[in-house]
Amino acid sequence: MTQFFIGIMAMLMCMACEKPLMTGNQEEEETEGNLMIKVFEIEKTPFGSLTRATEEASAVCKHLNYAVYSTSGERLKQVNQTTGTSEFGTASFQLDEGKYRVVVVGHSSNGNPTMTDPTCIKFTNAQTFTDTFLYSDEMTVGEDQVELNVSLNRIVSMCRFVLTDDIPEGVKKMRFYYTGGSGAFDATTSLGCVNSKQDVKIDITNGDQKQFDLYTFLHDEEGVIHLAVSALDASGNELYAREFDVPMEQNHITWLSGAFFSGVSTTTVTGVTVNTTWEGEQHLTF
């Protein structure tokens, strides 16, 4: 099959974002090609607002991951980028003529997701879970240069946990352990693909820290996560604990707020009306 230089030009426009990896089938980015992905700016709809804003990619996410797969799902090429590097926002690949699936992921986790299989792109608890955006589609490479303009969409749901009472002395860490969502997603559907046990621990550096954002990939457009929240001392001993059943929706925030340290031990949230616009919020109290 004849080789062609492929250059992708990809303007990443998100509604609502490490260096090239060269192990296995992952290769260093080609400097020229007939398929080139270039990121100029990102159009996003912030979780907290129904208005759109356009920003540079580096203002929205810390990492961009580009992958090219065969139509059978084999990963052929991958380039990982982080902000602050000269190549951030531009990726170029050399491919044979044929059909491919192109996947671009934008996020701010502490590392790159595992992208071996496009139907199960995985983040880990150690990497943390953040606002995440996706482009995924099939395309054809022919004799002529291909410039592919892509638009990324937010695929996560967020639970914003807000404390309305003071954090007692001795609490050094908040732990959020939740099930019902997924730490991995299927790039062909944008939905969660595994039953994860997501575990997030956040250090408490001062008593003014009252808001904690938790992300997950739902298995459907709507779902419920079971959230166990605990406050730990410096030795990891549990001082306070409560549990919640939290309704979630893709691309939406669920605000969960209340007096954590002075309330009852278990709360179940029911009868919640969800804003069904593209981007919306629901406010729950406990």
Regions found by a protein language model. Name each.
Residues 58-116, 172-252, 280-286:
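Tryptophan-paired
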Residues 149-156, 216-220:
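Conserved "repeat-terminator" motif of extracellular CCP/Sushi domains
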Residues 13-47, 251, 275-285:
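Bacterial Sec-dependent N-terminal signal peptides
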Residues 39-58, 162-170:
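Structural motif
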Residues 1-16:
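Sec-dependent bacterial lipoprotein signal peptides
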Residues 20, 82-87, 109-147, 234-263:
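Structured interaction patches on ligand/partner-binding surfaces of diverse proteins
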Residues 154-172, 181:
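Surface-exposed interaction/gating patches
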Residues 257-286:
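Hydrophobic, glycine-enriched assembly/anchoring segments
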